[in-house]
Amino acid sequence: MAKNKALFECQACGNQQSKWLGKCPDCGAWDSFVELKAEQIKVLKELAQVSMKTSEAVCIEDVELEHFTRYSTDDNELDLVLGGGLVEGSLVLIGGSPGVGKSTLLLKIASNLAKQGKKVLYVSGEESKAQIKLRADRLEANTPNLFLLTELCLENILEELHKKDYSILIVDSIQTLYSNKITSAAGSITQVREITFELMRVSKAYNISTFIIGHITKEGAIAGPRVLEHMVDVVLYFEGDATKEIRLLRGFKNRFGGTNEVGIFEMTAKGLISAKDLANRFFTRGKAISGSALGVVMEGSRALVLEVQALVCESSYPKRSATGYEKNRLDMLLALLERKLEIPLGHYDVFVNISGGVKVSETAADLAVVAAIISSFKNRPLSKDSIFIGELSLNGEIREVFSLDTRLKEAKMQKFKNAIVPSKPLEDIGLKCFVAKELSQVLEWM
């Protein structure tokens, strides 16, 4: 009798190898390979055969376009991120840290869609019906078309889907489900991958729009195989500090629209609502203090004025820390200050914080970060009427940023008077713009 071929799978990313490896060549995880049992390998082969369909090549000019049906979720922020509304039969994956409000958001959306007359099935593997009902009472989300199911078995969920003509399915969360066809534990790579595949098949076959909540790892990525994000139609990340009110919903993948928009929500006593009057949520206009500078960043099509806070203090064992800002970018800016402005930061602790719990990734905030650091180092307060916009290069030049006019218009609306920018705006905004091409010019202005 021929010996069965062994198959090992990485529990971190789903990579498969014919022999055990100490380190995964795909994701780099150590000691993550486990051997799959014969039953698991058999199921994987059967599922792979089901998904294989023969088709003929067709000339691209003969392909007929599909017209997707969209409908509003009655939430302007979510509709914005989804590209104009929810597409019928789409599969949406939402990830986020514990306590950020994923379940609260989807329960609100479930209620909105149910009030439109659509039948919604909310499946929870983490909470009881009574717990969900308590939250629904608080959110005023009770409606006859919203059905609750506390179930962990995929086959039982699919059976319930076939009983009623559901239009919306919400799964909270994908890591808690298991399939009877697979012998591995719930939340394993194989379970997550194959359950998602089955949900995708059902969504497309019956035009059921499906939301899936996914846990995230300590690195901030959605737990489970990387192929999970490739299988779904839309990938959204829910960000925010659980101790603060503002939440950001970012799109990282969207087969039916763009990914350049960000939804902004506010956590209130009645749940998540579309945030209003965002202008003063991320900065204060109080007394000028050292270590504080204001900048303007773009979040999708929005311009937001943010306060950058910096603390520089002498230390025998200097360290650098950044909250809401990239640590590697901060290290580069500190090296630039030492090299170009001869500011001796080698014996100083440097802490940088972006107020409001917002994570800044664009380089247009470089100038504001540097201004806050210099202000703290020299103990020299900066005017609250001034904003700093610009990207810094490695040679100390201040480079232009995109959407400069949009940023300056937002600053004007917030009644700022001065702007330190790399170039003049295309139109007269009504601000005093001080053009700085090099970092040394900013120091002279300060």
Swiss-Prot record:
Query: What does the record give under GO molecular function?
Result: ATP binding; ATP hydrolysis activity; ATP-dependent DNA damage sensor activity; damaged DNA binding; zinc ion binding
Entry EC number(s): 3.6.4.-
> Which biological process, per GO, is one annotated for this protein?
recombinational repair
GO (cellular component) term, any one: cytosol
Q: Which Gene3D superfamilies match?
A: 3.30.230.10, P-loop containing nucleotide triphosphate hydrolases
Metal-binding as a keyword? yes
Q: Where are the zinc fingers (C4-type)?
A: 10-27
Cite the Pfam families for this sequence.
AAA_25, ChlI, Zn_ribbon_LapB
**Motif RadA KNRFG motif: positions:** 253-257
Q: Name residues in a coiled coil.
A: none
Task: Report keywords, A-Z.
Answer: ATP-binding, DNA damage, DNA repair, DNA-binding, Hydrolase, Metal-binding, Nucleotide-binding, Stress response, Zinc, Zinc-finger
Q: Does the keyword Hydrolase apply?
A: yes
Q: Where does ATP bind?
A: G96, S97, P98, G99, V100, G101, K102, S103
Q: Where is this region: Lon-protease-like?
A: 349-446
Return the domain comment text from this UniProt entry.
Answer: Has a putative N-terminal zinc-finger, a middle region with homology to RecA with ATPase motifs including the RadA KNRFG motif, while the C-terminus is homologous to Lon protease.
Which family is it part of? Belongs to the RecA family. RadA subfamily.
Question: What is the purpose of this protein?
Answer: DNA-dependent ATPase involved in processing of recombination intermediates, plays a role in repairing DNA breaks. Stimulates the branch migration of RecA-mediated strand transfer reactions, allowing the 3' invading strand to extend heteroduplex DNA faster. Binds ssDNA in the presence of ADP but not other nucleotides, has ATPase activity that is stimulated by ssDNA and various branched DNA structures, but inhibited by SSB. Does not have RecA's homology-searching function.
Q: What is this protein called?
A: DNA repair protein RadA
